C-alpha cells in the first residue's frame, strides 16, 4: 500500500504513476495493390539508362500511378526494341534520310515518356486523366511511325535480299540451253529485179503504157 500511495502522492517520486518501458512504434498499412515481379522488371527496363526509380514507384505511390508508369514503360520498351533492330540492320543509302527522320521522332517520344515516368516516381506529380489520355493519343500517332519502320525493316533485311539475289543469279547462269525460246524466222521481203523501171512504168500515162507494151511484143 505504501508503494502505491507513493505513486499517487504529490510528494512522491512518480507524480502520474511509474512509467513503463514500452515504446510507441508506428504501424504502416500494407498497400492494397500488389505488383508482380514482371511488372517491376518492365518498369525498371523502361526507365532511362542509369536511372533506377522503380522501387520508389512501388514503395509509396498509388495504384493509379503504378498503372500509368507501367503503360509508359511498355511503350518505352517497344521503342527501344525498334531502335535496336534498326541499329543492327544495314540501311541502304537511298533510305538513310527517311530512316533518320523516323528514328529522331521515336527518340523524341521516348524522352517525353522518360520525363513523365521520372516525374511520377520522384515527385508527387500524377498525370490527370486528360493529360494521360493526351499522351496516349500522341503515342498512338507515333505507332504509325513504328509501322512504317516495321515495313522498312522487312524490306531492307540485307541477308535475305542477298540470298535471294544470289539464288536468282544461279538460276540464270545454270539455265539449260534447250529452255531458251527458239528464234522465229523472219519473213523475207520480196525482191524486185528493177524497181526503178517498175516505178517509171507506173508513172507513165495510159497511152504511153500501151505503146511500151506494143514495142515489147514486136521485139518478142
From Swiss-Prot:
Location, primary (coarse class): virion
Key words of the record: Host cytoplasm, Host Golgi apparatus, Lipoprotein, Palmitate, Phosphoprotein, Virion, Virion tegument
GO CC entries: host cell Golgi apparatus; viral tegument
Entry-linked InterPro entries: Herpes_U44
PTM characteristics: Phosphorylated. Palmitoylation is necessary for Golgi localization.
Covalently attached lipid (S-palmitoyl cysteine), positions: 11
Cellular location(s): Virion tegument; Host cytoplasm; Host Golgi apparatus
Subunit structure: Oligomerizes. Interacts with UL7 homolog; this interaction mediates UL7 homolog incorporation to virions.
Family: Belongs to the herpesviridae UL51 family.
The protein's role, per its UniProt record: Plays several roles during the time course of infection, including egress of virus particles from the perinuclear space and secondary envelopment of cytoplasmic capsids that bud into specific trans-Golgi network (TGN)-derived membranes.
Protein name: Tegument protein UL51 homolog
Source organism: Alcelaphine herpesvirus 1 (strain C500)
